[in-house]
Amino acid sequence: MHSIAIFGGTFDPVHNGHIKTSLAIQANFGFDSYYFLPCKSPAIKPPSFASSEQRVEMLKLALKPYPDFKIDTRELDRDTPSYMVYTLQSFRQEYTDSSLTLIIGYDGLLTLPQWYQWEKIISLANLLVINREEFFQQPVPKSVQTLLNQYRNDDKNILLNHHAGSICLYNAGHYDISSTKIREQLKQHKDVKNNLPDLVYDYIKKQGLYQ
């Protein structure tokens, strides 16, 4: 069965934590296809944020050394509101016989009940939840715990060979980097070069982003 990983985020900007996490996931799971899925930014956003086009360009630059990582822009291309359930339905229509796995952080798991039509997500894809080991001990909403009790399975072979319906918790390592922190540091003219791919850093400086 063809296995597809979908790593969604605003990537504003994409940073070394995103890349290292993805490399760790691929080293352990070996998905046949791995997509970075840039999400739409909120309609009302600070002017210091990058445009959709700039975020995609930074992703292209960051992923140049990794040809197996692809970019999927279907959320950005959609004129209507972009909900993950719609995105997964679109993937499922395109890849009817493939295993789909949505990669989210543990914070995403905790807020899952706030997602639009969140109950449908597990029927459309598997969930790969990434974060540090200690965060796995945090209390979860009752509805999420019920979901974990029913669908959790940390066997990667189950994840790779089932169309949907499994939740795997995985420690991909700890990288103390966030796009929010990088934007704040750039605004304060602090050095962030070590946290960004070189080509992305050069692009940000050339475009004058996040000032």
Curated annotation (Swiss-Prot):
Return the InterPro entries for the record. Answer: Cyt_trans-like, NadD/NMNAT, Rossmann-like_a/b/a_fold
Signal peptide: which range, if any?
A: none
Q: What does this protein do?
A: Catalyzes the reversible adenylation of nicotinate mononucleotide (NaMN) to nicotinic acid adenine dinucleotide (NaAD).
EC number(s) for this protein? 2.7.7.18
- Keywords in UniProt for this one? ATP-binding, NAD, Nucleotide-binding, Nucleotidyltransferase, Pyridine nucleotide biosynthesis, Transferase
Q: Which GO terms describe its biological process?
A: NAD biosynthetic process
By sequence similarity, the record places it as follows: Belongs to the NadD family.
The molecule here is called Probable nicotinate-nucleotide adenylyltransferase
What lineage does UniProt assign to this protein's organism? Bacteria, Pseudomonadati, Pseudomonadota, Gammaproteobacteria, Legionellales
**Organism whose genome encodes this protein:** Legionella pneumophila (strain Corby)
Question: Pathway, per UniProt?
Answer: Cofactor biosynthesis; NAD(+) biosynthesis; deamido-NAD(+) from nicotinate D-ribonucleotide: step 1/1
Per the record, what are the reactions this protein catalyses?
nicotinate beta-D-ribonucleotide + ATP + H(+) = deamido-NAD(+) + diphosphate
Q: Which GO terms describe its molecular function?
A: ATP binding; nicotinate-nucleotide adenylyltransferase activity
